[in-house]
Amino acid sequence: MKDLMFILPYQAGTLAQLTGALSEAGVSLQGCSGQQFGPEGIIHLLVDNAAEAREAAARAGFVVRGEHEVIVADIEDRPGALAGLLAPLANAGINVSLTYLATRSRLVIGVDDVDQAWAALRATGR
């Protein structure tokens, strides 16, 4: 899966315009994270079709500022689940650059080496 990052003006309706444009193009959003920094917001969207999402965003006047392949791992809704999921990555010396929850109790994880991270997680049965 791909995480697309956008920097949007912190104005009412901007995120609705972006997500509406993606919806009209048939792009399914599997996860979303955002935070305001001064006059702007940084938005991360987990999409099922990055190429179509980029094109739809561009048609609506939005620019993708970052695109990363990410891990989307199932995570239980219980105390310690996040620590247990991240521990194999830490033990393998993998830096985590991004996390947010996605649909259906899944965690999006941004790392420098996706293959190495998957190997570390799979070694623990994930």
Model regions and ranges:
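A conserved regulatory-domain signal marking ACT and ACT-like small-molecule sensing domains
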Residues: M1-R126
